[in-house]
Amino acid sequence: MKTLSLILIFFFLNGCNNPLLNSHGTIATEEYSLILISFIMMLFIIIPVIFMTIYFSLKYRSTNVNQIYKPNWCDSKKIEIVVWTIPIIIVSFLAFLSWSYTHKLDPKKSIVSLNNPIKIDAVALDWKWLFIYPDYNIATINEIMFPVNRPIVFRITSNSVMNAFFIPSLGSQIYAMPGMTTKLNLIANDVGKYKGISSNYSGHGFSNMKFTAISVLKNSTFLDWVKKVQASSIKLNTMKTFDIISIPNENYSIEYFSSVKKNLFNKIKNQYSIKHFILDENLSHEIVKKNFNMEK
């Protein structure tokens, strides 16, 4: 009995540390509320259905000879009203809830705060994350830091296939697309270390494509970390260096870059833009044409 009790306790408490259900940011808390409300509303359908399934199975079983047999019964307005009205009300409520929360939690929507936001550019590589702090001219791989209660504005792109950026404890997932910029606004309300992941399959190293998001209490602690990164001997000031760190690699360790090439994020993004391909194609045509004329 004691063993069974321990197993049940372990089973029911197993989800308590799930980041989705253990929110530490305003956006994540709102999303948790949406999940909880939707779950409770679904129970208004699921519980009666399970109850009626068991009840009708017992009441109208073949061995129960005490029930009245009605072979010509085919209609009940009471049942029709119940089975249509209740689902319509619940679905309508959930539709309104989803619509309102979709606008309320729009990833591009700025978070209102008295504190100035921190800007972080995130680039999905194979299979690691590059983070650029444009206001501090530094970059990191697989680690970010920010003070609590200070909005974070992410610009996200990919230098490889489509990916997805997600810090479950803080809020929304957003896709990372090559040649595109997606935006995400988050904020941390508690001090802690949170796991960030890639939530979209991007190759055999995808499962190890994780990073650490650290929220600190004081802005001075964050600035000390910035100075630590600035003291690094490694610089990310050429595209050649970027090409080296872009080489596919699993289990890539945390790395700091004391300076970053100007406008690097846009240069990465524009590698995959239509305009870039058109310019490359036109340039190739000009080179071919020039070589052809020289041969003539």
Swiss-Prot record:
GO terms for molecular function: copper ion binding; cytochrome bo3 ubiquinol oxidase activity; cytochrome-c oxidase activity; oxidoreductase activity, acting on diphenols and related substances as donors, oxygen as acceptor. GO terms for cellular component: plasma membrane. GO terms for biological process: ATP synthesis coupled electron transport. Residues 55-78 are cytoplasmic. Coiled coil: none annotated. A lipid is attached at C16 (S-diacylglycerol cysteine). Its main location: membrane. Residues 16-33, 100-296 are extracellular. Pfam families: COX2, COX_ARM. SUPFAM superfamilies: Cupredoxins, Cytochrome c oxidase subunit II-like, transmembrane region. A lipid is attached at C16 (N-palmitoyl cysteine). It is found in: Cell membrane. InterPro entries: CcO_II, CcO_II-like_C, COX_ARM, Cupredoxin, CuRO_UO_II, Cyt_c_oxidase_su2_TM_dom, Cyt_c_oxidase_su2_TM_sf, Cyt_o_ubiquinol_oxidase_su2. Keywords: Cell membrane, Electron transport, Lipoprotein, Membrane, Oxidoreductase, Palmitate, Respiratory chain, Signal, Transmembrane, Transmembrane helix, Transport. Residues 1-15 form the signal peptide. It is a multi-pass membrane protein. The chain crosses the membrane at residues 34-54, 79-99. Belongs to the cytochrome c oxidase subunit 2 family. Heterooctamer of two A chains, two B chains, two C chains and two D chains. This is Cytochrome bo(3) ubiquinol oxidase subunit 2. The lineage of its organism: Bacteria, Pseudomonadati, Pseudomonadota, Gammaproteobacteria, Enterobacterales.
